[in-house]
């Protein structure tokens, strides 16, 4: 996919985001709130928490092995309240919704490989080999020089618009807004560089007595214009605000939500490939989550060190085995070093075994709920360990030594 865009001198690329009040994002936040509550008390707990929301009902289910107890219904209602579903007229609120739970222990067959990896069973004594990957699969990380946070511009702007939509609702700037909402940004690229914004789409849930004309004018003035750089807007930029003309019924009343249904919103907005695994509700032994974070960490530090303008890394695992099956990279013809040398730098500076990832990034902490809306990656307002650029100097030193040796 990326090669198709890269071979065209002019193309459009679109990414979307959703607000914290979107039904799928309600579920992600609940699942990660449960994870945080458990991991705060029991850092080595195994958690796979799924949530579904629908009209008047929340169902929390999954497989959890832990020594602690958390009051899940109380957590659920707290998340719903924090999001802003607090009025009965919304049709779904924190006080009246039903909460059902169905929690089992993690399968002992899975635990056999996670708690004692294949390497450990063979007699290897390195403690970082003890934890096996929690599942098979492939995970991707990506970084580019397009934005200060090393994220693609379309998803970066879409997230900022969604956050702004929630902000003007919560601070009273646009008090008639309700929690559900979406954003979408289409960027026009010329020779791989962002040239202009082709279109901006906003869906904003609202009270019934507000006119479409007022909503459109308010959203453009208070949401779009403060976020989109003026140098990327022109007279041809198209704005679509509540394109159906009405968005009163929203949230779980209008759409059933599930954990893990917004995986491209959570990552790169489709600009990079995705292995298919979701993040929220999963403890860090699940490489769906932790290896994606690590892959982002690697890609971001490599790009920041000047090795490429765009870099995508794939890592693959087998359940119960600590060492990855494969590591590969794609630099989209932007690399300043051959791929073999870049892979050697990755091997030198980054340990991709699950236990090493968990320890090096400090993942056995309650840091996950804050990532469950507005993206897990490229969040400059959060101190996320996989977003740190603390390997850049060491990478540059290795680049220098490789240059000298040649």
From Swiss-Prot:
Q: Which Pfam families match?
A: S-AdoMet_synt_C, S-AdoMet_synt_M, S-AdoMet_synt_N
Respond yes or no to whether keyword tRNA-binding is given for this record: no
Q: Which UniProt keywords apply?
A: ATP-binding, Cytoplasm, Magnesium, Metal-binding, Nucleotide-binding, One-carbon metabolism, Potassium, Transferase
Q: Which residues bind L-methionine?
A: 63, 106, 255, 286
Q: InterPro entries, per this entry?
A: ADOMET_SYNTHASE_CS, S-AdoMet_synt_C, S-AdoMet_synt_central, S-AdoMet_synt_N, S-AdoMet_synthetase, S-AdoMet_synthetase_sfam
Q: Which GO terms describe its molecular function?
A: ATP binding; magnesium ion binding; methionine adenosyltransferase activity
Binding site residues for K(+)? 50
Query: What does the entry list as the binding residues for Mg(2+)?
Result: 24
In the Enzyme Commission scheme, what number(s) does this protein have?
2.5.1.6
User: SUPFAM superfamilies attached here?
Assistant: S-adenosylmethionine synthetase
**Cofactor binding: number and manner:** Binds 2 divalent ions per subunit. Binds 1 potassium ion per subunit.
Where does the UniProt entry say this protein principally localizes? Answer: cytoplasm
Localization per record = Cytoplasm
Task: Show the segment(s) annotated as Flexible loop.
Answer: 106-116
The record's note on quaternary structure and interaction partners says: Homotetramer; dimer of dimers.
General function of this protein? Catalyzes the formation of S-adenosylmethionine (AdoMet) from methionine and ATP. The overall synthetic reaction is composed of two sequential steps, AdoMet formation and the subsequent tripolyphosphate hydrolysis which occurs prior to release of AdoMet from the enzyme.
Annotated family: Belongs to the AdoMet synthase family.
This chain belongs to the protein called: S-adenosylmethionine synthase
């Amino acid at each position: 996919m990326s090669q198709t865009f890269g071979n065209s001198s002019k193309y459009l690329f679109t990414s979307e985001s959703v607000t914290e009040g979107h039904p799928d994002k309600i579920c992600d936040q609940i699942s990660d709130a449960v994870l945080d509550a458990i991991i705060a008390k029991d850092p080595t707990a195994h958690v796979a928490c799924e949530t579904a929301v629908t009209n008047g009902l929340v169902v929390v289910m999954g497989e959890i092995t832990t020594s602690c107890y958390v009051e899940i219904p109380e957590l659920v209602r707290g998340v719903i309240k924090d999001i802003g579903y607090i009025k009965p007229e919304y049709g779904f609120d924190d006080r009246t919704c039903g909460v059902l739970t169905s929690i089992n222990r993690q399968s002992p067959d899975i635990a056999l490989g996670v708690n004692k990896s294949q390497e450990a069973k063979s007699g290897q004594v390195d403690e970082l080999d003890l934890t096996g990957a929690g599942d098979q699969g492939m995970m991707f990380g990506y970084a580019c020089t397009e934005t200060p946070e090393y994220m693609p511009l379309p998803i970066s702007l879409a997230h900022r618009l969604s956050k702004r939509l929630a902000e003007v609702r919560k601070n009273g700037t646009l008090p008639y807004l309700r929690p559900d909402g979406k954003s979408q940004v289409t960027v026009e690229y010329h020779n791989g560089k962002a040239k202009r914004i082709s279109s901006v789409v906003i869906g904003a849930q609202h009270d019934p007595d507000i006119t479409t004309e007022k909503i459109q004018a308010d959203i453009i003035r208070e949401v779009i214009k403060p976020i989109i750089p003026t140098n990327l807007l022109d007279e041809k930029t198209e704005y679509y605000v509540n394109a159906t003309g009405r968005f009163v019924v929203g949230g779980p009343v209008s759409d059933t939500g599930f954990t893990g249904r917004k995986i491209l919103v959570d990552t790169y907005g489709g600009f990079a490939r995705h292995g298919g695994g979701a993040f929220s509700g999963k403890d860090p032994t699940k490489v769906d989550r932790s290896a994606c974070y690590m892959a982002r960490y690697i890609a971001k530090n490599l790009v920041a060190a000047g090795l490429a303008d765009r870099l995508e890394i794939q890592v693959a695992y087998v359940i119960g085995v600590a060492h990855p099956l494969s590591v590969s990279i794609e630099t989209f013809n932007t690399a300043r070093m051959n791929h073999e040398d870049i892979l050697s730098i990755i091997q030198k500076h980054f340990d991709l075994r699950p236990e090493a990832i968990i320890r090096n990034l400090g993942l056995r902490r309650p840091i996950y709920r804050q990532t469950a809306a507005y993206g897990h990656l490229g969040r400059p307002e959060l101190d996320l360990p996989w977003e740190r650029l603390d390997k850049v100097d060491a990478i540059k030193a290795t680049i220098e030594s490789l240059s000298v040796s040649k």
